Amino acid sequence: SFKTKIWNYINSIISPALNKAVPLVSAGFVPGMTDGADNVLFWFQDGEFDANGVGPNISASLARAYQRRMYTAYYNMPLHTDSRTLWRWKAKKAQLKAGMATQPNFLLTGDSWTQNNELATAIAGVLSAEYGDAGLGWRTVNYGASRDGSNIFRSAGWDLYDASPTSGAPLYGCGIDGQSINTTTNTAYFNVTNVRCTDCRIYYQDLNGTFQYGYDVGGVTQWTTVVCGNTGTTKSVLLTGMTDEVRTIYTKTDGNAGRVAIHGFYFWRSGVAGCVMSKAGNAGILADQFLLFSDKISEYLSTIQPDVIAIVIGNNDYRISTGTQTFRTALQTYMAACRAVLPDVGFILMAPPRTNGTAVTPLVDFRDVMYDLSQTLNCEFFSIYDLFDTWTEMNGLGCFIDNLHPSTVGGNMIASSLNNALIKG
């Protein structure tokens, strides 16, 4: 038969080399060559060439040939994943491009890398240039520069809650960024100034107090009073139908006889084509501090409706961490809480780069956890750790503003690479 002829031909080649004939084991599994100890060096399985493995020389050659340096000894994971889980985000962008009345919503959260302006402003700039700007998104009640030039003014009388390693759980709720203000006075006020919007949602805890919110119409402030119902839940009120212009949003506690807690604001421009990019980070936070308020995010996610949540975390954890298992559990729990509200929301886990801090646990270990979670939890991964070189090298190139945080240059570098890798899709 033809099979016999082929086998005889193979033996005619192999037998002189080994001085022995190679037996036919089965039609589907045929040894190609054995050594003196009868080890099979390679074989044919169902007619296809196969072997047990390749050595370092062939491996290196293949790595060079396919330019897959991330799978060699020094780069054992990809710089980023392939964006396949961001279907909600991609669909919203496609709707926007088709002229539909939709606003893709990007939410950036994590530690100081996401509360500070440099990275958030760079990402917002990329989105605005490509799709248009549909508003500021989230505005924290804590001080700190806003990416759009807006600001806040907080009077005396407010107590600030800021989730941190020493803060404990919030007694009166908090924002999606783990921050909140509360008061029992009747003279406190809080203003968000110089913000462009047509719509604003104010988030508060339904305690036993009274507050007012308002905005100017024709130079006269229009006020609305909220009498809280003491349910203890997080609620929100909506200001809508305002003209698309820069304005101030006011809140005050006139007539209050209980406790008022304000958690944050969300601004957008209704009817404007573009993306909303929310900056909702918390400087100093560890991953497991997200668990202080992960059970309080339903009101935010159900009303803001982010299409993708990007998390930059680990810059504090590696310096004061209790270990990577705590870090892993915190991210798993937080993502599960988000998906309980928005099952199809996309996630991007962003591993921070090497900074000039003193490590308690190697930062690379946290990067590895984030990549592993991207595989097990079906989300995306982006490694700033591998995008950047060492802190010394990147600081010399102007990418850091201090020992721990990115400069405008660093933010632009990250945003550009993130956009090409995942945001564009």
Which residues are covered by each model-predicted region?
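Surface-exposed receptor/substrate recognition regions of extracellular proteins
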Residues: 1-83, 91-102
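Alpha-helical scaffolding within the catalytic cores
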Residues: 81-97, 289-301, 329-337, 364-368
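Loop/turn elements at helix/coil->beta-strand transitions in domains of secreted/extracellular proteins
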Residues: 101-105, 131-134, 273-276, 304-309, ...
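Short hydrophobic beta-strand that contains or immediately precedes a catalytic carboxylate
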Residues: 106-110
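Conserved SGNH/GDSL esterase-like catalytic core that processes O-acyl groups on lipids
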Residues: 113-216, 220-329, 405-406
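Structured segments of extracytoplasmic/periplasmic soluble domains
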Residues: 116, 122-130, 300-303, 312, ...
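Catalytic His-Asp segment of secreted/periplasmic serine-dependent ester chemistry enzymes
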Residues: 294, 354-425
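Active-site segments of SGNH/GDSL-like serine hydrolases
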Residues: 310-319, 335-368
